Amino acid sequence: MGRFIFVSFGLLVVFLSLSGTAADCPSGWSSYDGHCYQVFSDLKNWDDAESFCSGQHEGSRLASIHSREEEAFVGKMASRTLKYTSMWLGLNNPWKECKWEWSDDTRLDYKVWTRRPYCTVMVVKTDRIFWFNRGCEKSVSFVCKFKAYSEDAAE
């Protein structure tokens, strides 16, 4: 009996470590590099998606992407969740003055554009990821992101 409990506990630990959801992210959210992410299949325009993300968790916004690795992580999540892998990111050009910015106020240090209107969608194909600019009024899926809770931050 003790051996069964030990083996069961070991399998549970392995399952939880491979599930992609860290203890510091809420259920249903995936963890990457200190942030929590969730892809939503609901179709919303950019403003409604941003508002929805803001209501999900303190500090949650449409996702900002800062590296190829982060982009690949979000792309993999999207391809598992969405039928059509086109989703809003937090990157927009709110005043239409060619001053692009992330909705979470992080620095624009990584970008992979293909075209140029006012809000940005990430499209995941089988072997490639593209960013397209699309009119903010279009309705597509979206991905939200927030900084993961840290035990150290609570002290």
Curated annotation (Swiss-Prot):
Report the subcellular localization.
Answer: Secreted
Q: Which UniProt keywords apply?
A: Disulfide bond, Hemostasis impairing toxin, Secreted, Signal, Toxin
- What's the protein called, per UniProt? Snaclec clone 2100755
Q: Which GO terms describe its molecular function?
A: toxin activity
UniProt domain C-type lectin: residue ranges: 32-145
One GO term describing the cellular component? extracellular region
Which PROSITE patterns is this protein grouped with? C_TYPE_LECTIN_1, C_TYPE_LECTIN_2
Which species is this record about? Deinagkistrodon acutus
Q: What task does this protein carry out? A: Interferes with one step of hemostasis (modulation of platelet aggregation, or coagulation cascade, for example).
User: So what family is this one in?
Assistant: Belongs to the snaclec family.
- Signal sequence span is 1-23
Spell out the disulfide connections: 25-36, 53-144, 119-136
Q: What is its main location?
A: secreted
Other notes: Shows greater sequence similarity to the beta than alpha subunits compared to other heterodimer snaclecs.
How this chain assembles, per its entry, is: Heterodimer; disulfide-linked.
State a single Pfam family of this protein.
Lectin_C
Is ATP-binding one of the keywords UniProt gives this record? no
Organism phylogeny: Eukaryota, Metazoa, Chordata, Craniata, Vertebrata
